[in-house]
Design a protein with these regions (language model features):
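Bacterial Sec-dependent N-terminal signal peptides
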Residues: 1-23
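N-terminal acidic, glycine/proline-rich low-complexity segments
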Residues: 21-338
């Protein structure tokens, strides 16, 4: 009898271990080309795929610049994941979007200066971001997808307004409610009364999506990312497996090296892939609002499903260690081995 109990215990333990190891399904929405932390975040996603932690269903650019998706496609190809689908914003629904700082266009510079391998042959055929989101979600189990947003809410406000189509009979909001588990988002500033980039670059979209998103939203804000820095030594040392690797070149084109860069977007990827245990704690539940100056505010309310991450010094150190460890690791199946 004791032997049977032991066998059953081992069997159940094995089943639970397999269930616990089930990859997190992630869709990544990024403003690739504005700040280089997006590149670090994307590198982390590939490494998580390598180790079986996540299943990256697709990547959406919240911009309409071709340089953004060309950069993403080159990264997909170099890291050995050429078939990850990519979406782009075809037209902007908001007239308030302005991005004229030429220094920020490292994605354009990087792909223009180097002959990277590409998988996509027809850039005009790349699907509109919200349409790709509908397509991807329609194929997933209910409540199974984590949306990681590290750019503007442009794709998502268009998703909210979308109607039934060839992919789903549901409207956009209903499809999000049915298929998403949660949204992990880098946006806002809950510690200072200052506007934050991902909010004010498409103010209209941020106001609407933060209010209307039908699932829980977990915010990693400006202050958290600013307090965790990606060391420049890693940029120099970690990417020698590929000639002219896009990540160190992005840092070079973005600003004069050497410099450490805040881990704004990588924290969202980390929390989505691994959870926040050991890395952060969560605030009380509440509402996130955006005023006319794009300043975010958090109001505690136990009936809401918005929260933000908080970190102490030990957790900051743990975040940096983990991001460095992941990005220093070479990919499993790189396109171009040096």
């Amino acid at each position: 009898m004791k032997k049977l109990i032991l066998i059953l215990a081992v069997a159940f333990t094995t089943i639970f271990a397999v269930q616990a190891a089930k990859p997190v399904k992630i869709i990544f929405d990024t403003d690739m080309g504005n700040d280089v932390d997006d590149v670090v975040a994307l590198d982390m996603l590939y490494k998580y795929i390598d180790e079986g932690t996540i299943d990256l269903l697709g990547i959406l650019s919240s911009k309409r610049e071709l340089g953004s998706i060309k950069f993403i496609d080159a990264m997909n190809t170099i890291y050995g994941y050429p078939n990850i689908p990519i979406g782009i914003v075809k037209t902007y629904p908001s007239e308030n979007y302005v991005c004229t700082d030429k220094r920020l266009n490292y994605a354009d510079y990087t792909v223009a200066q180097h002959n990277y391998p590409h998988t996509i042959k027809d850039w005009d055929a790349v699907e509109d971001g919200y349409k790709l989101l509908r397509k991807l979600l329609s194929k997933q189990e209910d409540g199974s997808v984590t949306l990681v947003m590290v750019g503007f809410s442009t794709n998502l406000v268009r998703m909210l307004d979308s109607k039934a189509d060839e992919y789903s009979e549901l409207d956009g909001k209903s499809l999000l409610a049915k298929k998403l588990d949660k949204v992990v988002i880098m946006a806002g500033n809950f510690h200072e009364k200052k506007k934050e980039y991902n909010v004010y670059k498409d103010h209209y979209a941020a106001v609407r999506f933060y209010a209307e998103c039908p699932v829980s939203m977990l915010f990693t804000d400006y202050a958290l990312g600013k307090s965790t820095l990606y060391p420049y030594q890693t940029v120099y040392e970690g990417f020698k497996y590929c000639e002219n690797h896009p990540l160190p070149l992005s840092f070079h084109y973005y600003a004069q090296m050497p410099y450490n860069r805040p881990l704004w977007d990588p924290t969202a990827v980390l929390f989505a892939a691994e959870g926040h245990k050991g890395y952060a704690s969560l605030s009380k539940k509440g509402y996130v609002t955006v005023d006319q100056k794009s300043i975010t505010d958090f109001t505690v309310d136990k009936h809401s499903n918005r929260q933000y991450y908080e970190v102490n010094d030990a957790q900051r150190a743990a975040i940096v260690r983990r991001v460095v460890e992941l990005t220093m690791r070479g990919p499993k199946n790189p396109y171009n081995k040096k």
